[in-house]
A protein has these predicted regions:
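Glycine-centered, small-residue-biased loops immediately flanking beta-strands
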Residues: 169, 261-262
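Mid-domain Rossmann-like dinucleotide-binding core that forms the NAD(H)/NADP(H) cofactor-binding site
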Residues: 79, 140-221, 226
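Acidic carboxylate diad motif detector
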Residues: 266-267
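Helix-to-beta-strand junctions that scaffold the AdoMet/dcAdoMet cofactor pocket
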Residues: 257-258
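Glycine-rich beta-strand-centered segment in the early N-terminal region that forms part
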Residues: 20-34, 48-95, 136-139
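NAD(P)H dinucleotide-binding glycine-rich loop of Rossmann-like/cofactor-binding domains
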Residues: 91-174
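C-terminal substrate-binding/catalytic core of Rossmann-like NAD(P)-dependent dehydrogenases/reductases
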Residues: 226, 271-315
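N-terminal glycine-rich cofactor-binding segment
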Residues: 5-21, 38-69, 84-85, 102-113
Length: 315
């Protein structure tokens, strides 16, 4: 089979490699679609801790396909079944795993990160992934290219679940990249009264406007605070999602939030510059809640898959 194989920083080769052999409890999936995200780019550039020097591996952790081969003990996943493969597995017995947060397990594994992934014609699904419920059936009506977005969309779902958004609330999304667009679309589907998107990159701002996802503001050309106050009856944003790895965005969120507002620092900062300066009195006197989420659990992937299948959010 053909596969894109990582050999080192900026060295990704399309090679003819053997089709994986499966063992007891494992599955072989024929890949229909595998999407690329920022994690894959960090891997490619040699900036991922799970790809140390000397690693030779097939990346790709956002994978959709059909069951090509299943062991005799895998009656729940017959040959031909279309599935999304949730990438993250935990140890299965730590506190994080048993409370549904296997993405936070200290001993996690992930397809395409710690084992060969989906940038290939076939991918082997480890027995642990099958046992922990990571193989999610998808309907025939769902485009494989859309289903492959289940994992990043699950990260978005996890982020918004932490914010406990209520219908009618004003939502500000800072950053209109793919993740920011997903956040804006999901917020609308969940009943946000107003969605405002802040984006300085012209192409991304134009795309957000074409998608009609809300009021799009270029903070370099407009006063974001003034626009937000106009759209919120001078209250500020009930929900702020910082979907950009920017220090200024995190710092300004506290000022832009309404009283009792909730903020999610969704985009991580560069590891060599991880600190920000904040006015803690704004947190105290406005009773703000600041949270963050990272990656997604298997449960988040199931919920994201159900939302995609429902058609409520067009990805």
């Amino acid at each position: 089979m053909l596969a894109a194989v990582y050999h080192g920083p900026n060295d990704l080769r399309v090679e003819d490699v053997p089709v994986p052999r499966i063992g007891e409890g494992e599955l072989l999936v024929k890949v229909h679609s595998a999407s690329i995200c920022g994690t894959d780019l960090r891997i490619l550039h040699g900036n991922h801790r799970m790809y140390p020097s000397g690693t030779v591996r097939i990346p790709g952790h956002e994978v959709v396909g059909s069951i090509a081969e299943a062991g005799a003990d895998q009656k729940a996943h017959p040959a031909g079944q279309r599935v999304f493969c949730a990438p993250n597995t935990g140890c299965g017995h730590c506190l994080q795993c048993i409370t549904g947060n296997n993405n936070l397990c200290a001993n996690y594994d992930a397809i395409g990160v710690t084992s060969d992934g989906g940038f290939a014609e076939y991918v082997r699904i480890p027995a642990k992934s099958v046992q922990q419920g990571n193989i999610i059936p998808i309907g025939d009506a769902v485009d494989p290219a859309v289903a492959a977005l289940t994992e990043p969309f699950a990260c978005v779902v996890r982020g918004q679940n932490a914010l406990r958004m209520q219908p009618g609330e004003v939502v500000l999304v800072i950053g209109a990249g793919p993740i920011g667009i997903m956040h804006a679309k999901l917020a609308k589907a969940r009943g946000a009264g107003q969605v405002i998107v802040s984006e300085m990159i012209p192409d991304r701002a134009d795309q957000a406007r074409r998608l009609g996802i809300g009021r799009v503001v270029d903070p370099a050309a407009e006063d974001l605070k003034q626009v937000l106050w106009q759209e919120s009856n001078s209250r500020g944003a009930d929900i702020i999602i910082v979907a950009a790895p920017a220090h200024a965005a995190q710092e300004s969120a506290l000022e832009l939030a309404a009283i009792s507002g909730r903020i999610n620092f969704f985009g991580g900062l560069p590891k060599d510059r991880p600190t920000v300066t904040i006015d803690s009195n704004l947190i105290h006197y406005k009773e703000l809640v600041i949270t963050a989420t990272t990656a997604c659990s298997t449960a988040d992937c199931w919920q994201a898959s159900q939302i995609i299948a429902s058609g409520l959010v067009d990805l």
